[in-house]
Amino acid sequence: MKRPTIQDLANASGVSVATVDRVLNGRHRVREETARRVYNAAASIGYHAVGLLRQRVFQDLPHHRLGFLLQRPTQSFYQTLAREIEQAANANTSSRVTAQIEYTTASTPAAIIEKLKLLASRNQAIALVGPDYPAVTAEVEELKAKGIAAFSILSDLASGVRQGYVGLNNRKVGRTAAWMIAKAAKRSGKVACFVGSHRYLGHELREIGFRSYFRENAPDFVVLETLINLETPEITHEATINLLKQHPDLVGFYVSGGGMEGAISAVREEGLAGKLAVVVNELTPDSRAALADDVVTMAIATPVKSLCNELITLMTTSIGSEGDAVPGQSFLPFDIYTSENI
């Protein structure tokens, strides 16, 4: 594919080549509205100097440094989340945003706190995914005292201390998973729920919603003891195989967090595609294939692009402002996928 030329950019912007040249080289002042139109067109057509254009267009805006602490860098979902954070940072038009993304492969308080301190040394606001530990709350409180706002994403933590939460209403997510299983199961019977850890408030709320739906609306189903999978495919695979052996009359299960790849492989291994009602979290290449093969009944997904745009806006707004400048919770509508809309 031919690389877009300056003429292509002028055509896409609806301005002359001379105007594009002025924006690129900053020789003469161009109206802000026109400069932004040229930049947006450059981004949309993949113009090679889009980085330079951004620098020219937004050079007078404040510079904000934002830190992000994510989990498990090898997982498809977190890779997608990182890409969307970068894109949202680059697309922000109220300030120039530099995003620093770090990962932690261990969910221990010490590992999380170490990364938070690293991010705090370089950034003005921080967002993190993690379990809710008292030690982490204490660290978030220390950051707050230093004027560094912390936001929880996907799973809430440090309630009353963190600046805000951006993610799904996890209780509703759990109830929706239960609703699907109750409707899709071949008959009433035993159902199970996997959580990554009881320290993940988001998983706990999903479990609460899952159980409450069955208790209120489908009492003829039996919800088994909750299974811990540490969000790893290996543990989830083994736990699913054991679950199916111990309860051959199982009619469905829900993986509320990570590790669904192991559950999917276990259902395939046991030849149970189409025989169980299975709900997983997030749409990834693995869950998409499982939906197509009738291994998974439904995937409940986070609108990652919307989450990142909202998060960047709230984080930049929080810098240098009072605590009530941003909402305490920002719930996003979740996406639902079945075999018919992937």
What are these regions (language model features)?
Residues Y133-K172, T284-A292, V296:
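Flexible loop/hinge segments that line or gate small-molecule binding clefts
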Residues I126-L143, F210, I228-D286:
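Hydrophobic alpha-helical
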Residues A125, G147-F151, G164, K190, ...:
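Proline-centered loop/turn at the N-terminus of a beta-strand
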Residues L61, Y165-V191, T236-H237, S287, ...:
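Hydrophobic alpha-helical segments within soluble ligand-binding/sensing domains
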